[in-house]
Amino acid sequence: MSKKIIVNRRSVLKYGGAASVALATPYFFTRGALAAGENYRNAPKGDTVTFGFNVPQTGAYADEGADELRAYELAVEHINAGGGGMLDTFTSKALTGGVNGKKVTFVTGDTQTKSDAARASAKRMIENDGAIMITGGSSSGVAIAVQGLCQEAGVIFMAGLTHSNDTTGKDRRANGFRHFFNTEMTGAALAPVLENNYGRDRKVYHLTADYTWGWSQEGSIQKYTEPMGWETVAAVRTPVGAGDFSQYITPILNSGADTLVLNHYGKDMVNSLTQAVQFGLRDKQVNGKDFVIVVPLYSRLMVQGAGDAAKGIFGSTNWHWSLQDEGSKAFVKAFGEKYGFPPSQAAHTTYCQAILYADACQRAGTFRPSEVGKALEDFDFDGLGNGPTTYRAGDHQCFKDVLVVKGKENPSSKFDLLEVVEVTPRAKVEYPADMLGGELGPYNDGEA
């Protein structure tokens, strides 16, 4: 069984690596618990309902995982209170305190940024802790694995930070939903900015994380930059958590490439970017051009780790704490008051997913996955920091504006590290629901 502790700011930081955490409650859920007339997996019958937060508490993406846990705790506080943060700016006003008359508690697991560990962790939360929904993660490999498990188990999966096209493409599932954007959107938004700043006809070297997200990101960048004459001279796969990337960077020096695209994330991006700059790549001239580096998927946490190496480097992001819409300001204020620093995009997307799930349950009047899913499908909303957004029914992918950013040359603080250079309208990153392959299939409500 999972250990339950009283959660506050100190305990979240102290127990960030714990196997599971829950808000203090006298009621413990058992597998297959039922409410009257509710015959679906883990239907709650007491006065509480349990969410399962599955995040990387160890491994290369642990910084994102820690921020996700902070955001989830804040979201649970706001859901139970019926207000606070972006719940006050959210266009849906269904949540007024708890969900369907029940207080939300939660348990957590460590994905370790490994698919097998993530599935095992999610399975424990579903079977041992009665989790009605699983959410979280910072790896697309993990997301796809856990999404498949949740489909089999009959619970909803609200994906965390997952950027591979496959999550809502060929590996989409009816029980899975993604708020975060994907590599297709990154390519569409980022390529015009790269052309405007670096021109056409460049020789490109890709270093790519060797799993579904890296492959997807590499492919999307190639798709949108090759028409402007950006030719791939090499695409080299690197293991997640490599640490030392020198053996992968050395061959770039004599490759004839004048552009390096780092399809890395988390500590891997911090290490590979820092080492590429230390090797002098940004000081080189090749083919009569200044050598440039591109990081397609950025986060403030990564830039914080990379320091000066990230200055002036372009990328994309799902959200940034400097946005001035009412939702973003409310979230930054609430998160900052609780933790003392601004939230990351990982924190933002996971907070949104918790709110969106709770709201859908409230609007549906049940926690039954098929009914909750229908409440999310083609749901139009605003007030959660990304502008007008739609949860498309065809693939369970959110569509919203995309931010193109670059590392600030003269940051005013250790958090003021990214500059938003363009907000790409949602219409420019939309695509047909069947373009990326895959089928949702039927909902699974699970066995009671």
Role assignments for model-derived ranges:
Residues 48-67, 204-207:
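Short beta-strand segments enriched in small/hydrophobic residues
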Residues 108, 112-130, 196, 246-256:
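Short, well-structured alpha-helical segments in soluble
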Residues 70-105:
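Signal peptide-proximal N-terminal region
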Residues 39-40, 70, 116, 128-236, ...:
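Extracytoplasmic ligand/sensor domains, especially the bilobed periplasmic-binding protein
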Residues 380-448:
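Solvent-exposed, acidic/polar segments of extracytosolic/periplasmic ligand-binding ectodomains
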Residues 28-54:
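C-terminal segment of N-terminal export signals and the immediately downstream linker at the start
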Residues 2-5, 11-35:
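N-terminal export signals
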Residues 266-269, 321-379:
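Extracellular/periplasmic ligand-binding modules, especially the Venus flytrap/periplasmic-binding
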